[in-house]
């Protein structure tokens, strides 16, 4: 039979004896961390013996990773296509300890996600060429509106500072514009900055979250090792670049000054983007409307201001309907606009003076500065307007792909803008005094009205892009704890990024009206416009440089070239625009300072409040001493205790025990936590653990969200999912106990994770998807627990062998029938008496003012007021 089974024919020699059976797998234990003495430790606290392998493996791409398999698969190192021998246990342990320091205390939530499906990366789908072209067409209407409308006002602002005396001024200004576009948007953003994306997300906060994942630089101390397993987290083999990256990482983590500087840069960049949201609509709309001057008799400055204000009111009034209602028109209008720019530019080149192509010679930049001196330096403030909106290429990356943005800029935007500016320069070579309205004067008479209509629509679309970017920045800042809670309305059921913030919308409208009515001139607004743009670019340069050092591990020479080349150019432009502070440049600085103070104060107060909660948390021993009744009467019902702690029992629970005459039979501590990733997959969102013994009926639930995730769940559906998940948790816990008992395992670690994954793929952009899934948890749902791929026992057999499970499930059903109660803290944050005056002023007045006027936390839960119970607390920070 053995010969037949193995397919061996008759041979004179007897078959070799079968190999000895492999040793049985070790007990269900998991490797967690390295001990202080250099050894390894299991989750249950026992040391790894000398015969057990270190928790490392070397895979084919020559990268180190922490093994999440059972001990049977964790031993040794396996070589791959990349070759290379196994690392020694001592060197790998020291390297791991240096890359990511372990928490002092082993908490179950630090281990639970080690078996999360997809923890080591998510496969990226290749986008077809047709899809890339279609996406590139869409970027014209969303990304490039601001930059595309810059020909309306660039030359008029430049030559308002440098009068045209000869062709040197025209060719020099044209050469400056051409090389500025080629250097900043084309070289910096298209080829470098776009690659520094956070899983396809761009913007200042995306860079910050990317840095926070590789170094613990967030000031809010709620980071956990478990968060590293949300997305791919790999350690490369030791190299000089990696050693340098580790040194940078350690410096950032150890020095609180560096953390504050990094946060300050991020908040300043975000504040500048909000400033752009105020200045862009004012500048774009007023530039488009000013084309009627000289064409319509009696249409003077007052008429321009009034019509611009009417357009602005209309623009902000339709925001509540969402960009999706008119978004399909954006790309065709902007495509038509770029075609007009290129066509009119070619017409002017052919008709007036094609010799302006000499501006490709950068020597005219030198002649421009040599001839005009300080005036030429002042003209840089107008020249920088040609790259307004360049940051949108990176900020709006989440809606498109890197390749689509690169294709659109390289194939359409870049050539059309160059031709448009050359056409205007050719017109000025013949009519040097037509600088005030150079764009409309260079348009052929027969095309004026069609071009005016398209220009006005393009200006409003450009304004829409910056308004939407402002809304997105506010939402991201709120998610990362850097902005007070305000109302956010999702205007699309399919597109997650389409949001509307009423308070910010009307604030922007009022500010835009004030700016137009006060400045009354595009040249004066341009003085303020440039500061915000250059400020955002310099912040992105600093953050991308840090990404190169810490994450990309680029060669040091190339790293230094990036800030030296681009940073020096941006610094020169910054000095030019800062010289216009008295002429209107103070405006963006005032707006940025206001929002910077708001965001930094909110973050500062939130960090102090969290630290105060950590100091006041209740010990588990105290809860155990109270017994299963918790020192009070347990009545049927489920109490959801909302708190911000990821570990420990919050102090609000102690207040509840003292204040309430009875306590719910089932207690779930719910922590809503935002992690520095754009999206958390639904199957990785929830972490569960049991607190105390079974008869306590107390659980912890940590719900993790990315800074671009949407929380839009009705309380009834959320409660249903929570209960079903809790039931799954209890069954898997019982199953785990049965398996360990049958395997004669060592003392069981009572930690489990339930990941409920829908049988059909879930799209992150669908707002109908709730916290876990949009399906009832049933037979078609896969479940995973921490102890690897353990076999699943039938529910019936488990319930027969474990009566305590049926008792606990019956108690849960009784609690469900009695209903849910949401228990929240209504806290007052006060500075301690011994604090400095500045801290008292910030916390007791400014932060308290923001807390009183921000949106209440209960408003985001969408729970009937009859189901909410709030307990007053005072946090001394």
Swiss-Prot record:
Segments of this protein annotated with the region Disordered: 1-60, 72-92
Main location: membrane
GO molecular function, one term: potassium ion transmembrane transporter activity
Residue ranges, Extracellular side: 148-173, 282-295, 347-379, 428-441, 520-524, 579-583
Alphabetically ordered keywords of this record: Ion transport, Membrane, Potassium, Potassium transport, Transmembrane, Transmembrane helix, Transport
GO biological process assignments: cotyledon development; potassium ion transport
Compositional bias per record (Gly residues), positions renumbered to this chain: 76-86
Highest taxon, organism lineage: Eukaryota
Membrane-side (Cytoplasmic) residue stretches: 1-126, 195-260, 317-325, 401-406, 463-498, 546-555, 605-877
UniProt biased composition (Pro residues): 12-28
A Pfam family it matches: K_trans
Location of the protein in the cell: Membrane
GO cellular component, one term: membrane
Cross-referenced InterPro entries: K+_transporter, K_trans_C, K_trans_N
Topology of the protein relative to the lipid bilayer: Multi-pass membrane protein
Residues annotated as transmembrane: 127-147, 174-194, 261-281, 296-316, 326-346, 380-400, 407-427, 442-462, 499-519, 525-545, 556-578, 584-604
Annotated family: Belongs to the HAK/KUP transporter (TC 2.A.72.3) family.
Record function comment: High-affinity potassium transporter.
UniProt name for this protein: Potassium transporter 23
Species this chain originates from: Oryza sativa subsp. japonica (Rice)
Lineage per the UniProt record: Eukaryota, Viridiplantae, Streptophyta, Embryophyta, Tracheophyta
